[in-house]
């Protein structure tokens, strides 16, 4: 059975170092897709690079935890900025869902304005779209527009919650992250997916060159390690040996 493998690099547009790392991992490695933060400091730079790489799938990385929102969000921001207090608000069930739905539409339009095309798919920074309160908003938004959505099926409590016409990969892994970033780790993800019989798999990654913006991230130098592994010739060969076909979300 042929399996489609999407290796999606998150955080396109976060910084120039992030952008260059993603492009390097696409040109000389196994990355096939990326998702862009439209409020990132280097989003225009990301869009410029993407025009030179028309085969690179570019989706939208919905942001509710970093930087300035595109629209006014008084119910979620503090001093005009987004932040990680969204987790506490989710636990307290005090999320401003109308503001979030409006911000999603505004970020989507901003993506189209910057990239000149619709995104191939949607996911989110820090996986906030998988919050139980937010997921239905994003899932129906994606389904209405006919674009795919990253779904962590271990988080979705009920498959009936998914719109029938929503596209996604059968499998998703965020395990290529943290302290153990190795070729063996990546291949274990593929083998586990194949064992489950999944015909399509998305693996999340964050390859980057370190710059001043990346240094401010709690997840900094492992991004360099990711880049090294993802551009390994032996990894590309091992993926091919396992019968995976590189693809993007337009292929599912």
UniProtKB/Swiss-Prot annotation:
Pathway: Glycan degradation; chitin degradation. One of its GO terms (molecular function) is chitin disaccharide deacetylase activity. Mg(2+) binds at residues 61, 125. Keywords: Carbohydrate metabolism, Chitin degradation, Cytoplasm, Hydrolase, Magnesium, Metal-binding, Polysaccharide degradation. Gene3D superfamilies: Glycoside hydrolase/deacetylase. It catalyses: N,N'-diacetylchitobiose + H2O = N-acetyl-beta-D-glucosaminyl-(1->4)-D-glucosamine + acetate; diacetylchitobiose-6'-phosphate + H2O = N'-monoacetylchitobiose-6'-phosphate + acetate. It comes from the Bacteria. GO terms for cellular component: cytoplasm. Its cofactor is Mg(2+). Involved in the degradation of chitin. ChbG is essential for growth on the acetylated chitooligosaccharides chitobiose and chitotriose but is dispensable for growth on cellobiose and chitosan dimer, the deacetylated form of chitobiose. Deacetylation of chitobiose-6-P and chitotriose-6-P is necessary for both the activation of the chb promoter by the regulatory protein ChbR and the hydrolysis of phosphorylated beta-glucosides by the phospho-beta-glucosidase ChbF. This is Chitooligosaccharide deacetylase. It comes from Salmonella enteritidis PT4 (strain P125109). The gene is chbG.
């Amino acid at each position: 059975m042929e399996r489609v493998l999407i290796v999606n690099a998150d955080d396109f547009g976060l910084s120039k170092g992030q952008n260059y790392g993603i492009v390097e991992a696409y040109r000389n490695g196994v990355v096939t897709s990326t998702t862009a933060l439209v409020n990132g400091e280097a989003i225009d730079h990301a869009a410029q690079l993407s025009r030179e790489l028309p085969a690179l799938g570019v989706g939208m990385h919905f942001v509710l935890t970093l930087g300035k929102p595109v629209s006014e969000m008084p119910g979620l921001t503090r001093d005009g900025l987004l932040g990680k207090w969204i987790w506490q608000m989710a636990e307290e069930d005090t999320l401003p869902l109308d503001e979030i739905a409006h911000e999603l539409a505004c970020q989507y339009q901003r993506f189209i304005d910057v990239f000149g095309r619709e995104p191939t798919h949607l996911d989110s920074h820090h996986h906030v779209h998988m919050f139980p309160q937010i997921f239905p908003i994003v899932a129906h938004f994606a389904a209405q527009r006919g674009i795919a959505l990253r779904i962590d099926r271990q988080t979705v409590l009920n498959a009936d919650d998914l719109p029938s016409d929503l596209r996604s990969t059968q499998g998703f892994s965020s395990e290529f992250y943290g302290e153990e970033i190795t070729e063996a780790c990546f291949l274990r993800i593929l083998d586990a997916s194949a064992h489950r019989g999944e015909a399509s798999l998305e693996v999340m990654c964050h390859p980057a060159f370190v710059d001043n913006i990346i240094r401010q991230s709690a997840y900094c130098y492992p991004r360099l390690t990711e880049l090294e592994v993802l551009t390994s010739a032996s990894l590309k060969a091992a993926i091919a040996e396992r019968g995976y076909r590189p693809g993007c979300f337009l292929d599912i």
